[in-house]
């Protein structure tokens, strides 16, 4: 039996626990929060409502409580916008209050203390990095410099499709090949190398970058329950640091190789320059008010590896799945390509502006299957949206997935109809851009912190998809193409739950075998 001291200890623990829990979960009485589920469980908040894929669970809650809802995830205030109007108010009308991204434990550990463009807090140095992205690293001139790399990788990808499918006799797991393809483009642009049997270094880097993506998408209790942050009950702290050290060692090795190569070359050197060369130029630049740090350069390269690989691969897999399920769309896209390009050469990036239906196909995929179904901001101060109070430091989630399926904006919202993006009186022109000006379609975000790599991603996806339409017929499920399972999986990037398996039957071979 317990003596009086034992009872006092239990009472003290109960008292402290009660005060702690109330201090964590009690909502400020004077705040008028957006509507949401009525029951918040201690320590968990509304997490039991979010057991399925997060974007799907939040969409279901929005159908019940409205386009702007409030939930507690642990002790964290989370506000979710699921309509174009609420997204516009957050990303444009009140943008200055929402210019930060939430800084998670993993992102802080893996990106050199948030030294990258994606997670760095809004301010002077962020504006400096933004300027570098737009004028140097991802400018139109820089993208044009790498056009031959992208085109040669498309050709190599098509040849590989023919080889591994036995000219259409065997199924190919498209996700694996698409990820390899997009990764090869990015690694050649960044460091002048690609993944192949002779280059284990790039293969190792790709594996580590995949680990980074998994850690960034993992649910860490310390991110949502403040007092658990230093406890690291799930062991993510150790995993984050181990992975960061591996990434840093590889990035540092590449930087040093570039420095050594630059030291040896003369003015007439014909060595092809890549993004690491541009980064080194910026690191070494004199007289700037801000200087690019070595850590920011490595963090930027890591951002490029992550965003430039899985996102485009996801969209391409979804596009193929929709095309094989909708043969009339596939037929129309191919006819457009042949009418513009002919039947004697491979479609190129320079042809894309003359292919409005192909552009519409990709837009329709991005509407229904955005690679990142939710993107996040953070409230830098307490403010109001739609008449509701948004507490300072709240996480703001913009559901691009829900907005793209909103019947208030899209007729037959769940049907795959690329024609919706063409002007009815001039089908030769495409309407509605995807770079953030139209709030009913936000696959790359909007505003100051929209994705700076949108133009590069579109170039890669459009040219690759056009070539796959031009060069192959696609057979799924022994010809039962309409039976493709369109279920979803994934946290940060959403893929098909069951990877798409196709037989690519060659139809047009525009290059030497």
UniProtKB/Swiss-Prot annotation:
Chain residues that bind heme: 451
Function per UniProt: Heme-containing cytochrome P450 involved in the biosynthesis of soyasaponins. No activity with lupeol, butyrospermol, tirucalla-7,21-dien-3beta-ol, taraxasterol, psi-taraxasterol, bauerenol, alpha-amyrin and multiflorenol as substrates.
Enzyme kind, highest EC tier: oxidoreductase
Gene: CYP93E1
Protein name from the UniProt record: Beta-amyrin 24-hydroxylase
Catalytic reaction annotation: beta-amyrin + reduced [NADPH--hemoprotein reductase] + O2 = 24-hydroxy-beta-amyrin + oxidized [NADPH--hemoprotein reductase] + H2O + H(+); sophoradiol + reduced [NADPH--hemoprotein reductase] + O2 = soyasapogenol B + oxidized [NADPH--hemoprotein reductase] + H2O + H(+)
PANTHER family, per database record: 3,9-DIHYDROXYPTEROCARPAN 6A-MONOOXYGENASE, CYTOCHROME P450 98A9
PROSITE patterns found in the cross-reference section: CYTOCHROME_P450
SUPFAM superfamilies: Cytochrome P450
Pfam hit, one: p450
Cysteines paired by S-S bonds: none
Localisation: Membrane
Principal localisation: membrane
Species whose genome carries this gene: Glycine max
Similarity comment: family membership: Belongs to the cytochrome P450 family.
Alphabetized UniProt keyword annotations: Heme, Iron, Membrane, Metal-binding, Monooxygenase, Oxidoreductase, Signal-anchor, Transmembrane, Transmembrane helix
Annotated membrane topology: Single-pass membrane protein
EC number: 1.14.14.134
Transmembrane segments: 1-21
Gene Ontology MF terms in the entry: heme binding; iron ion binding; oxidoreductase activity, acting on paired donors, with incorporation or reduction of molecular oxygen, NAD(P)H as one donor, and incorporation of one atom of oxygen
Gene Ontology CC terms, in alphabetical order: membrane
Signal peptide region: none
Cofactor(s) the protein needs: heme
Organism phylogeny: Eukaryota, Viridiplantae, Streptophyta, Embryophyta, Tracheophyta
């Amino acid at each position: 039996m317990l003596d009086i001291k034992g009872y006092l200890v239990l009472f003290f623990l109960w008292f402290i626990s009660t005060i702690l829990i109330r201090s964590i979960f009690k909502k400020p009485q004077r705040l008028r929060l957006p509507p949401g589920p009525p029951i918040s469980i201690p320590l968990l908040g509304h997490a039991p409502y979010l057991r399925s894929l997060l974007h799907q669970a939040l969409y279901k809650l929005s159908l019940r409580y409205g386009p702007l809802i409030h939930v507690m995830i642990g002790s964290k205030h989370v506000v979710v916008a699921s309509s174009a109007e609420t997204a516009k108010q957050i990303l444009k009308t009140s943008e200055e209050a929402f210019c930060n991204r939430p800084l998670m434990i993993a992102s802080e550990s893996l990106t050199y203390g948030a030294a990258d463009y994606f997670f760095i807090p809004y301010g002077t140095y962020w504006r400096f990095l933004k300027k570098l992205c737009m004028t140097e690293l991802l400018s139109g001139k820089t993208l044009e410099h790498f056009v031959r790399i992208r085109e040669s990788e498309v050709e190599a990808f098509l040849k590989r499709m023919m080889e591994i499918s036995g000219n259409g006799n065997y199924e190919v797991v498209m996700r694996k090949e698409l990820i390899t393809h997009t990764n090869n483009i990015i690694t050649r642009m960044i460091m002048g190398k690609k993944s192949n049997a002779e280059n284990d270094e790039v293969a190792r880097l790709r594996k580590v970058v995949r680990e980074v993506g998994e850690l960034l998408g993992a649910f860490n209790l310390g991110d949502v329950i403040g007092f658990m942050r230093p406890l690291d009950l799930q062991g993510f702290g150790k995993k984050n640091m181990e992975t960061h050290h591996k990434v840093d060692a590889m990035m540092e090795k590449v930087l040093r190789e570039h420095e050594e190569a630059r030291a040896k070359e003369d003015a007439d050197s014909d060595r092809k320059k890549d993004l690491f060369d541009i980064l080194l130029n910026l690191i070494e630049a004199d007289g700037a008010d801000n200087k690019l740090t070595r850590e920011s350069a490595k963090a930027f390269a890591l951002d490029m590896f992550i965003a430039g690989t899985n996102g485009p691969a996801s969209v391409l897999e979804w596009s193929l799945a929709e095309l094989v399920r909708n043969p009339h769309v596939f037929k129309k896209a191919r006819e457009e390509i042949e009418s513009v390009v002919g039947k004697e050469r491979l479609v190129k990036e320079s042809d894309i502006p003359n292919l409005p239906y192909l552009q519409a196909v990709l837009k329709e995929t991005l509407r229904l299957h955005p690679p990142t179904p939710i993107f996040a901001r953070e409230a830098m101060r307490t403010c109001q949206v739609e008449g509701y109070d948004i507490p300072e430091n709240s996480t703001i989630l913009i559901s691009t997935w829900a907005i793209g399926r909103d019947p208030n904006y899209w007729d037959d919202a769940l049907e795959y109809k690329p024609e919706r993006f063409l002007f009815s009186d001039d089908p030769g022109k495409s309407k509605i851009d995807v770079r953030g000006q139209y709030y009913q379609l936000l696959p790359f975000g909007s505003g100051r912190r929209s994705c700076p790599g949108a133009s590069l991603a579109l170039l890669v996806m459009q040219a690759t998809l056009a070539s796959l339409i031009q060069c192959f017929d696609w057979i799924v499920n022994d010809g039962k193409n309409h039976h493709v399972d369109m279920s979803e999986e994934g946290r940060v990037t959403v893929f098909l739950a069951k990877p798409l398996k196709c037989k690519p039957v060659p139809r047009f071979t525009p290059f030497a075998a």
